C-alpha cells in the first residue's frame, strides 16, 4: 500500500492553492486595469521666507510654542496632482479639476461605491490626471492663513448639489437612497486652507499643463470659470469639457451681459480683451448640465442659482460660436438622461454620462 507523508499533502495543498489563484486571475482579468506607470507631483506654487538666521539647535523642534521662524521658508500654493497612465495609452490625457468644496475625490469612487470617471476613462485607455487645486485637499499648504469653519452645513450642500430639498431626495434623482451613500457624500466636502485665489489657481493648473504637455481639461462647477481663464494662459489645453460651470464666464469687452438675478444673489460675468477671448474660439468645448433646473425663477435657491448658470452658459455659448468657436451645450434631460444632480460624474447613471463625453471626444478627433 502507498504511504502518504505530511510533506506530500503539503505539496498537494500548495499546488491546489496556486491553481485556484491562477484560475481566479484568469476569470477576473477582463476587469483589471493595467497601468504603465502612476505617481504624483506638485505644480506651480510660491515660496515665502522670514528674514533672519535659522538656528537648527534652538528652533529645530516642533514642540516650543514660541518657536522662531527666522531664516525659514514655506513652500505652498501649489496644485497636487495624481496621475495614472494605462498601457497602450491614448495620446491626449484627461485632466480632472474639482469644484468648490470638493477635491479630486469627486472623480474617484462614487458615494455609493461604484467607479468614478477616473477608472471609467482609464478603461478607455485615457491617461488621467486628478488635481487638488492650491489650498485644497492634498495641496493644503497655503502661504496665507485662514479660519476653517466647523459650521453644520451638510443640508446646504444637499440642496446646492440638487439631491433634493431639506433631507428628501427629488423623485427619480440619480443618487442612491442608501444612507451610507449620503454619509459618503457629506464626508467628501473639503475646506480651503487659505483664502480662495483664482489667479493663483489658474497659474498652478497652467503649470500642470506646462509639465505634461497637450491635454484635455475636464472641469466641474467652480473650476469651470477658472478653466476658461487657464485656457487663455496655456496653449496646451486642446479642449475643455465642463460639468455644470457655475460662475466665471468671460465675454469680450463690450459684450458682457447684464447680471442674472437668482434667489439671494446675482450671477455676473467678466470681460477680457477680444484678443484674449479669441483663444476660446480655437478649441472645442462641451458643457453639461443635469436635471431639476427650472426654466423660470423659483424660491428654492438650490435650483434657482443653477437656472442662472445655465442661462449664462447659453449666452456664453452663443457669443463664442458667433465668433467662430465650437461650444456644445448639453442639457442632459433633453438627450434622455433624467434625474442628474450637480455632479453627474458621480450619479447612478455616470456610465451613460461618461459615454456622452467619450462620443464627443471621438467626434472632435480628440481620442
Model-inferred region functions:
Residues 339, 343-367:
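Catalytic active-site module of serine/aspartate enzymes centered on a nucleophile-bearing elbow/loop
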Residues 27-89:
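N-terminal cap/lid segment of alpha/beta-hydrolase-fold proteins
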Residues 91-99:
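Short beta-strand element of the alpha/beta-hydrolase
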Residues 114-140:
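Conserved alpha/beta-hydrolase
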Residues 195-216:
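Conserved acidic catalytic loop of the alpha/beta-hydrolase fold
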Residues 247-324, 328-330:
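The feature captures the conserved acid-bearing segment of alpha/beta-hydrolase catalytic domains
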Residues 98-110:
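Active-site glycine-rich loops that stabilize anionic/oxyanionic intermediates
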Residues 218-227:
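Gly/Ala-rich beta-loop-alpha elbow adjacent to hydrolase catalytic centers
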Amino acid at each position: 500500500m502507498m504511504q502518504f507523508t505530511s510533506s506530500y499533502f503539503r505539496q498537494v495543498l500548495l499546488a491546489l492553492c496556486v491553481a485556484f489563484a491562477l484560475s481566479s486571475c484568469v476569470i477576473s482579468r477582463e476587469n483589471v486595469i493595467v497601468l504603465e506607470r502612476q505617481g504624483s507631483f506638485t505644480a506651480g506654487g510660491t515660496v515665502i521666507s522670514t528674514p533672519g538666521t535659522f538656528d537648527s539647535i534652538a528652533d529645530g523642534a516642533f514642540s516650543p510654542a514660541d518657536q522662531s521662524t527666522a531664516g525659514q521658508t514655506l513652500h505652498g500654493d501649489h496644485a497636487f496632482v495624481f496621475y495614472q497612465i494605462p498601457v497602450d495609452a491614448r495620446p491626449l490625457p484627461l485632466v480632472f479639476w474639482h469644484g468648490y468644496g470638493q477635491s479630486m475625490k469627486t472623480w474617484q469612487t462614487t458615494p455609493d461605491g461604484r467607479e468614478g470617471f477616473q477608472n471609467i476613462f482609464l478603461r478607455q485607455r485615457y491617461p488621467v490626471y486628478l488635481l487638488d487645486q492650491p489650498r485644497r485637499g492634498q495641496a493644503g499648504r497655503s502661504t496665507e492663513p485662514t479660519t476653517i469653519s466647523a459650521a453644520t452645513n451638510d443640508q446646504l450642500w444637499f440642496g446646492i448639489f440638487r439631491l433634493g430639498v431639506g433631507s428628501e431626495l427629488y423623485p427619480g434623482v440619480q443618487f442612491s437612497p442608501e444612507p451610507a451613500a449620503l454619509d459618503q457624500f457629506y464626508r467628501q466636502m473639503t475646506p480651503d486652507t487659505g483664502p480662495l485665489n483664482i489667479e493663483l489657481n489658474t497659474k498652478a493648473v497652467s503649470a500642470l499643463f506646462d509639465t505634461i504637455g497637450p491635454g484635455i481639461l475636464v472641469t466641474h462647477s467652480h473650476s469651470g470659470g477658472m478653466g476658461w481663464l487657464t485656457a487663455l494662459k496655456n496653449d496646451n489645453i486642446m479642449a475643455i469639457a465642463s460639468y455644470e460651470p457655475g460662475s466665471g464666464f468671460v465675454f469680450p469687452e463690450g459684450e458682457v451681459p447684464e447680471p442674472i438675478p437668482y434667489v439671494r444673489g446675482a450671477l455676473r460675468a467678466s470681460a477680457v480683451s477680444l484678443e484674449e477671448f479669441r483663444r476660446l474660439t480655437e478649441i472645442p468645448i462641451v458643457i453639461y448640465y443635469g436635471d431639476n433646473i427650472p426654466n423660470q425663477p423659483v424660491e428654492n435657491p438650490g435650483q434657482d442659482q443653477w437656472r442662472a448658470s445655465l442661462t449664462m452658459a447659453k449666452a456664453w455659448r452663443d457669443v463664442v460660436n458667433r465668433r467662430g468657436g465650437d461650444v456644445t451645450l448639453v442639457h442632459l434631460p433633453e438627450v434622455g438622461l433624467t434625474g442628474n444632480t450637480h455632479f453627474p460624474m458621480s450619479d447612478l447613471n455616470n456610465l451613460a454620462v461618461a459615454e456622452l463625453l467619450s462620443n464627443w471626444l471621438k467626434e472632435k478627433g480628440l481620442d
